[in-house]
Amino acid sequence: MLLAQGTPMLLAGDEFGNTQEGNNNPYCQDNEITWLDWRMTSAKTEILEYVKKLIAFRRKHPVLHQGRELYMFDSLSCGMPDVSIHGTQAWKADFSYYSRMLAVLLYGDYRKKDDGTADDSLYIIFNMYWESRSFDLPNLPGEKEWYPAIETYGNTFSEVPVPVRRKKRRRKPSLESQKKTIVPPRSIVVFVGR
């Protein structure tokens, strides 16, 4: 939800792993199924910290919360549409019944940061298939490159990287030489293009 346009809606307690034991309609119960155990915040710090970092990532990237509808075409004549949908192949969405994979490119030039500069582009890959899949990375205009930002696979949550500072040469490695990336099963991967 934190990567979607609009207002993200989290159920109270989601940020620290609260569960209603599979009950999706517990409004009429006044018992431990609906009570929030705030002590879990100290036991489930990994999830809570990850949600905080996702919120900070969302705030940093205005392309994730645009004030208008997206058109899926190049309305600014900048060479890229504001949003585009992809499959395992770049620019070729697969909407077949059995497809469990989708990638979304949000082009940063369509949303400005507070300082007036264009936001970074984001490439969000959803692999809900039960096996790893290879995804093409779309080419970015100019000298922009893809950098890994968020990964949701494995038993732990990866850290969102420290922002790249252009003055320092030490930075997270880009994927400039890669045209593809492998995404593990049932996971989401986000790349930042700058």
Where are these regions (language model features)?
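Carbohydrate-interacting/catalytic domains
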Residues: 2-10, 14-194
